[in-house]
């Protein structure tokens, strides 16, 4: 009995090898908007958008018949596995029963996915319903957002408090003039009362008019505390507001292109930052102080009959709120002048001192900023600047770290901003979309309606 060997000693039968994807013929992809695309862009668009339907391939040549009495392998459709089919008298498979499959390619594999769509552009924002946008806009128009905090009428408030303060002091002094003693003698009850109130408010303390009874001393204690705690602060705010307003008007006038020789004032005004330079603020404040001292000395020499040295001495001691008490205003005209002059001069001196402190602080901040921006980043600073710990520092992270290092912002400010971002990022995806914004507006509207319903 003849046994057929399991392995043939002759040459093995040729296998059916499919061509690789890189050996397949690639048709040129030409998008409608680009007439002559490069091969690189063609490959990129084929990978992203998928392949066009390839032309029908030519019929492959029939495989050579295997030798008689030999085993052959045929492809069985199913799980894409080659299953050996044994037969004693095999017959070559016909092309009609088992047509050869088309050679697979990478583009066919990518193009067969259903989650990829052929799209030339990506949407700029999340697709939203037009009705939802219109409803959100209507709700935003119906509910008035809270207005930004505005500066109160500080000038009016300061003026009213000053009138109330002076009226209270003048009334008490004029009603009970015997409770106060004057070293220079009384002139007029109202003038002496107004002079006493202004000297007390400006914390000068000449000592020429003093309380003599316990009731007057109790009144003086409350009068000093009220004046020091409230009215003086309001007057300082009023002076700051008036000076800032004048500065804004000057800056606006200089920004007008019709103004002549506006570039010559850049030494005084910083037009880029929209403010007056600190040095010029100090110079102007000191000039105002010098004018106040000069005016006071001239009036003292004429009204109080003092020499120039004593007049300048008393003026300087008055505007700096020292008030030794060796000299004071003794005449009626002098006390009326002092009631207005002391109020303006002492506030001008205080503002000059604040500008001096601002100049020193600004100089220190500039030196710190130059030092921070001139040096390189170390490894520890890199790790500190990497906020999200992803191994690299973005431009925004670098800017935030440098601002923190220069003292422009603090960690508390950053945390407050991050908390606001987290509240607006309802999807917790690290970004704010228009849908998130509309959703937050809708939530705010619902909360307001619930509050109104509870109140009603």
From Swiss-Prot:
Q: Where in the cell is it found?
A: Membrane
Q: Which residues lie on this side of the membrane: Cytoplasmic?
A: 1-152, 244-279, 357-456
GO CC terms of this entry: plant-type vacuole membrane; plasma membrane
What membrane topology term does the record carry?
Multi-pass membrane protein
Which residues constitute the signal peptide according to the record?
none
> Where, in this chain's numbering, is Ca(2+) 2 bound?
425, 431, 436
Keywords assigned by UniProt, alphabetized: Calcium, Ion channel, Ion transport, Membrane, Metal-binding, Potassium, Potassium channel, Potassium transport, Repeat, Transmembrane, Transmembrane helix, Transport
Subunit and partners: Homodimer.
Q: Which family is this protein grouped under?
A: Belongs to the two pore domain potassium channel (TC 1.A.1.7) family.
In Swiss-Prot or TrEMBL terms, this protein is called: Two pore potassium channel c
């Amino acid at each position: 009995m003849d046994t057929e060997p399991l392995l043939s000693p002759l040459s093995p039968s040729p296998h059916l090898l499919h061509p690789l994807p890189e050996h397949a013929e690639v048709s040129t992809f030409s998008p409608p908007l680009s007439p002559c695309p490069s091969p690189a862009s063609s490959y990129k668009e084929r990978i992203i958008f998928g392949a066009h339907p390839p032309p029908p391939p030519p019929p492959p040549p029939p495989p050579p018949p295997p030798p008689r009495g030999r085993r052959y392998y045929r492809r069985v459709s199913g799980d894409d596995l080659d299953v050996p089919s044994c037969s004693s008298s095999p017959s070559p498979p016909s092309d009609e029963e088992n047509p050869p499959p088309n050679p697979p390619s990478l583009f066919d594999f990518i193009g067969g996915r259903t989650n990829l769509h052929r799209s030339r552009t990506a949407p700029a924002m999340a697709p939203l319903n037009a009705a939802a946008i219109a409803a959100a806009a209507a709700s935003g128009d119906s509910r008035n957002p809270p207005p930004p905090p505005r500066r109160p009428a500080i000038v009016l408030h300061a003026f009213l408090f000053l009138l109330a303060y002076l009226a209270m002091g003048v009334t008490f002094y004029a009603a009970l003039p015997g409770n106060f003693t004057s070293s220079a003698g009384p002139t007029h009850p109202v003038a002496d009362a107004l002079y006493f109130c202004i000297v007390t408010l400006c914390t000068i303390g000449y000592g020429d008019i003093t309380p003599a009874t316990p009731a007057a001393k109790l009144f003086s204690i409350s009068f000093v505390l009220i004046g020091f705690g409230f009215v003086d602060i309001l007057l300082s705010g009023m002076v700051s507001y008036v000076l800032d307003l004048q500065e804004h008007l000057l800056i606006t006038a200089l920004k007008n292109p019709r103004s002549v020789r506006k570039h010559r004032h850049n030494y005084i005004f910083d037009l880029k930052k929209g403010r007056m330079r600190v040095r010029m603020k100090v110079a102007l404040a000191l000039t105002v102080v010098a004018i106040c001292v000069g005016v006071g000395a001239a009036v003292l020499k004429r009204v109080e009959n003092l020499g120039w040295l004593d007049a300048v001495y008393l003026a300087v001691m008055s505007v700096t709120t020292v008030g030794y008490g060796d000299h004071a205003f003794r005449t009626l005209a002098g006390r009326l002048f002092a009631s207005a002059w002391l109020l303006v001069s002492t506030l001008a001196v205080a503002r000059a001192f604040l500008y001096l402190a601002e100049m020193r602080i600004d100089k220190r901040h500039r030196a710190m900023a130059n030092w921070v921006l001139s040096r390189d980043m170390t490894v520890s600073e890199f790790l500190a600047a990497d906020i999200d710990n992803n191994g690299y520092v973005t431009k925004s992270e670098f800017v935030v770290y440098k601002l923190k290092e220069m003292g422009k912002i603090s960690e508390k400010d950053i945390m407050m901003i991050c908390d606001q971002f987290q509240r607006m990022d309802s999807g917790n995806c690290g970004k704010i979309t228009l849908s998130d914004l509309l959703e937050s507006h809708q939530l705010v509207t619902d909360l307001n309606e619930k509050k109104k319903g509870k109140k009603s």
